[in-house]
Structures are given as C-alpha cells and as structure tokens.
Regions:
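Conserved active-site tyrosine of GNAT-family acetyltransferases
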Residues: 1-3, 9, 65, 96, ...
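Short, structured motif recognition centered on aromatic/hydrophobic residues
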Residues: 2, 25, 36, 44-49, ...
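A compositional/structural signature marking long, glycine- and acidic/polar-rich segments
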Residues: 156-225
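Vicinal oxygen chelate
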Residues: 39-64, 66-135, 165-166, 183-290, ...
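An N-terminus-focused feature that recognizes amino-terminal "leader" regions
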Residues: 1-63, 67, 71-88
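Short beta-strand/turn micro-motifs at beta-sheet edges
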Residues: 34-38, 116-119, 176-180
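Core segments of cupin and vicinal oxygen chelate
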Residues: 1-32, 132-174
C-alpha cells in the first residue's frame, strides 16, 4: 500500500497506487520493492536503493562517501516516508545513476501473488539484479567496488566485444552488472528470480498469451547458471524472469572467472536486444539535449 498519513511511513493495505498514479510493487515481506512513476523526461531510473543495517551504518556510509569526494545529500523526512524507510542518503554514481542508501525498511505481511502459487527469491538477496549500460564502465566499476564495497563476481565478453562485469553486495551471484555498448547510458534490464523453472515456464505461457514481445528466448546463462527469458518492458528496457541463480556464501573461496560467451544454451536475440535498448537510450539522450 501507499502512505495515507504523512506522519507515518508506508502502511500496509490498499492497492499500492498513489494519488499521482505512481505504482508500488511487492515481491516479498518488504513493503515494496519497485516504484513505477510517471516521468515525462524519460529518465528511466529514478533511484536505486541499497540497504544498511541501521542508522549508525548509514552515517558511516555517508562519511565514507564524503571522504571520497562524493556529493551526498541527506534524504528529507518526506523522502523517507515516501520510500517507507527510517532514513536515507542520496548521491549519483559516475554514470549518472541516482543511488540511495537507506536503513529500517518497512516490513509487513508475507507476499501473496495474484498469480496462484507464484513466489519470488528476494528477502536478504534483494529484488534481483540490474544490468546497466554505461560509457563510463571503468569509473563506475571502481566506484561500486572501491568505494561502495561491492565484490567482483565474473566477467563475460560478448562476441569479442566489451561484454559485462558482474558485482555482488549479498549472497546473490550479482546485484549489479555493467556493460559498455557504445555511448549508451541507462538500464538494459531488471531481473526477477522466481522459485523454480516451472514458474519461469508458466510466466512464459502468460507472456505469450498477453502478446508481449520476447527479447531473448529461454536460455541458461554460463556464469550464474540462471535459466531465464527476457521480455520487452513498457519503457523500452528488458525484464528478465529466471530461476536457479547461483548464490555465493563464502567470499574468500570465490574466484572471479572470465567467460568468452554468455550462455550454455538459448537466449537467442540477447545481443540484438542490447543493441536495440542502446539505440533507444541514445535517442532519448539526444531528445533531452535538443
């Protein structure tokens, strides 16, 4: 649901739709994971949130960022209320993506999907992952690993090109991936993990029945072993629905690997999708400059 009383954080109940038309989507016991807002400027990503344990950790993160010459803003009480958290700070990564660190998210009832039997793999693993296209990949990678403390998981080279770099901040194989494709800056896809391959298949049945465009066929990634399908989202970027993603529980024993291809099988069309999303991002960027 969405907050009705400005003196309280987001409350349970309701349809999760705000007066301005914003929609808040739930995956697990967190009050919400995805905020969808009307944006006439086609910004795409309006915020990416990462959680810390408490207010002391938030203050430590703030000071750490300041020490590294990052411009940090304190989130207002209204910001915290609208996000459903105890408090937050705001800054941008070198690619221009707006990032927030927060503590004390509102938790409520367990998730119950309108699709019977559907569950997501989230909770302490976060909502899933983001694949970001960036012309400043090296600087952005250094920012997330050397300043924010993410760990490198793997590299993949696509068709001999720049490929993607995968990073984690919890046991999930990766929460963030960075790919360089020309001068494009923005999101290529967001991934949601479901509880089984059968759930992926049933989702694919619903996708086909709804006539939604499939960007990349069913396939299995070589690095995180996810079996998934990619579909075209309404804002131009892709949505990946997958299952059986690798988790990493011992950082000391994990050795990053470099792969020269992205998949064990399937995922036909994925490079065409990257090119299509990149072109769309470039067009939106040009529109914003005109």
């Amino acid at each position: 649901g969405f907050p009705q009383d400005p003196n309280f954080k987001i409350a349970s109940g309701g349809k999760g739709i705000a007066d301005d038309g914003s929609v808040f989507l739930k995956l697990d016991e967190y009050q919400w994971r995805i905020g969808v807002h009307q944006d006439d400027n086609n910004h795409g990503i309006l915020y990416i949130g990462f959680e810390v344990d408490n207010v002391s950790k938030l203050e430590e993160a703030k000071q750490h960022l300041i020490n590294h010459k990052v411009d940090v803003l304190d989130g207002s009480d209204e910001d915290a209320r609208s996000r459903g958290v105890g408090g937050l700070i705001k800054f941008s990564d070198p690619s221009g993506n707006p990032v927030e660190i927060y503590y004390e998210p509102t938790l409520d009832y367990k998730f119950s999907s309108p699709v019977a039997g559907q569950t997501f793999v989230a909770s302490n693993l976060g909502l899933g992952h983001l694949m970001i296209l960036t012309a400043s990949r090296e600087q952005t990678f250094d920012f997330y690993t050397k300043i924010l403390g993410f760990k490198l998981t793997d590299y993949i080279s696509f068709d001999g090109g720049d490929g993607a770099w995968f990073m984690r901040c919890n046991p999930r194989h990766h929460s963030m991936a960075l790919s360089k494709f020309g001068e494009a800056n923005g999101m290529h896809h967001i991934m949601f993990q479901v509880d089984s391959i059968d759930s992926v298949g049933r989702a694919l049945d619903r996708i086909n029945a709804a006539g939604i465009k499939i960007s990349s066929t069913l396939g299995k990634h070589i690095n995180d072993l996810t079996t998934s399908v990619y579909i075209k989202g309404p804002n131009g970027w892709d949505v990946e629905i997958g299952a059986e993603t690798v988790n990493i529980h011992d950082d000391d024993k994990w050795i990053p690997k470099q792969f020269v291809e992205g998949d064990i099988w399937g995922h036909h069309g994925i490079m065409d999708s990257v090119a299509e999303v990149s072109a769309d991002l470039a067009a939106k960027d040009n529109d914003g400059k005109n």
